[in-house]
Amino acid sequence: FTHHNSVGKRENATPVVLEMEGELKPGGFTGIWKEGPRSGKYGSQFTEFSAPSLMRHTLRTEQFTTLTVVYAVPTTPGRCRLMARFPFIFSSALPRMFFKIVPRWWSHLNQNAILEDDQIFLHKQERVIENAKVVKKQSYSQACYMPTKADTYVSAFRRWIADIAGGSPSWPEGMVDQLPPQTVSRNQLLDRFHAHTENCKSCSVAMGNLTKIRKALRVVSLVALVTSAAAFAKSLSPKVTVAFAVVAAVTAMLREFMGGLVQKMK
């Protein structure tokens, strides 16, 4: 629902029938979505929760295998450090070659956008659930209405937390076991620079390089524009005037495009 126009569209929504494979255990659970994504185009998707913090989706076809591998490690109440990988294993050499030449920071732009689709919802809903637990003395199943098969894995994970893991992470002695106040600033919740970029070698280096290139492009664009104007004023060859004008325009557009990439890293 939250990933509208990022990995799907709400108007294309269909029932997601998730099933447990076996019982919930101290070590986690496994499940299957028999139809799988894209209305069954790629076959069944398998899910594994390996306690306490690993979630893995696996989708296998004749052409490729793709995995979503996520570790979510609680750091303080209301915060987790997320470590995610999205491996693709191709039977053909051409897709493998393509994925190797795509810079890691480029793929991070899209992956972070998908994570941020959930950020505001999770931040606020966590406090609603905490209020139901502390003030209303409700369990998670009482506080949340989850009538569909799409809720199967969430329900199983919450039962693992409540029945097996003691209800919450084991925080270090002396740590305040309370959620911090709700953040009302959208910019603070979606602060990609401090949440990811400054800690990611690929993204931080790319951001620095893009900033330097933009400065150089600004100089080139201005010089080309001035040269084009001077050539026109001196009635030089129209080809010279047009050539420098084109250089000025192209470098300005490149600078604008790179500026958009830098903004996405902030």
Question: Language-model segments: which ranges?
Answer:
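Rieske [2Fe-2S] iron-sulfur-binding subdomain
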Residues: 1-266
